[in-house]
Amino acid sequence: MMDAKGRVWITQYVRPNEVPGWCLEGSDNPFADYYPIQHQRESRQVSYYDPETEKFVLIDTCYFTHHLQFADDANDTLWLSGSTEAIGWLNTRLYDQTGDERAAQGWCPTVIDTNGDGRITKPWNEPGRGASFDPNRDTRVVAGSYGLVADPEVGTAVWLSSAQYPGKLVRMDVGESPPESCLTEVYEVPSVLDPMVPTDLTGFGPRGIDIDRNGVVWTALSGSSAFASFDRTKCDVTGPEILDGRHCLEGWTIYPTPGPTIQNTDPPVRADYHYYNWVDQHNTLGLGENIPIANGSNSDALLALMPDTGEWVVLRVPYPQGFFSRGLDGRIDDPNTGWKGRGVWADYGTNAVWHIEGGKGTKSNLVKFQIRPNPLAH
């Protein structure tokens, strides 16, 4: 991901898998003292490439990383997903000032306020089959994390997707004095596991995740091939039922994506596959602001949803070019030239390039999408 200085941030290996001692029990690091990393072999950290110096800068992290996303805050916070036990972040402004990777990073375990006092306190219930549960304590969960996005309305909060069946959205607000102020919420995708949910409103398999400027979260359900939105403002985030994440069905809306269904599936599972999704917050495509778009990875398309009407706009890359997309993003090159100065870019995932017309040696591509305000617009 690119920052405001034009540097490109990457999650990558920067050291052998063994986690440094300062991340573990017995360290004087405040985050390790609060929650020492349990998995002592973590295989990916973070780096950035600076085009001006043409150099990579390697930054060690205590926690495993996978996806990365900047927050819109004064610290240029870089949120990092991937760890099954903690959510991590890097204060890139502090790192630029000091070069101190230990002081600039933090992490928190995913602990839910199951005793309802509005804060997380130790000791807490630990996860695990057969583990005892004390309702007077808070509860740590192994949520897992894949996609993530910062909350534009709450600068200290981040959302993540977990694909553990049927899938969950995880929200962590680190508060004003982390790690002690960190607090996690979990919301399970409505599924056939919950008898309260009608089968036609179920889904599973969130991967991609993004958010609109109003704080509504959008996730593409890669398992059931649907788009789901989640509005936390409709929820009561307290009570004993918050542990299983089924306490806010009213926050969810499921939008089945267009296309054929797989034969003999009940409830119907669509044949398309949505590797990731993105929300066009700033009208880079031309359909308006806050338009959610899913990768139609199995349908040679991007699928844009008009949330006010439920109408789908299918942006198909015509045969025989083929188009197996795994991600997309928007860019405004010139805000003063109308539709010509903006567009959405999507990639060809390299893992299926050899299935595209052309056979062996066929290379991946980028595709630019633009929508004119009318067919004759110039």
Please identify what each model-predicted range represents.
Residues K5, S43, T53, T65, ...:
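Surface-exposed loop/turn positions within WD40 beta-propeller blades
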Residues G88, A226-S229, Q321-H378:
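Blade-level signature of beta-propeller repeat domains, shared across WD40, Kelch, NHL, RCC1
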Residues I10-R41, T84-T110, L160-R171, S224-G245, ...:
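Short, conserved, GDST-rich strand-edge loop motifs in beta-rich repeat architectures
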Residues Q38-Y63, R93-A143, E176-T202, K234-W278, ...:
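Surface-exposed loop and turn segments in beta-propeller and other repeat-based domains
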Residues D50, N91-T92, D173-V174, D231-R232, ...:
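Structural recognition of the beta-propeller blade-terminating site
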Residues M1-K5, H67-N75, A131-G155, T202-N214, ...:
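Structural signature of eukaryotic scaffold interfaces centered on beta-propeller domains
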Residues R7-T11, D76-S81, A157-S161, V216-A220, ...:
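Conserved beta-propeller blade signature
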Residues R44-Y48, L68, A86-I87, L148, ...:
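Hydrophobic beta-strand positions in blades of beta-propellers and related beta-sheet-rich domains
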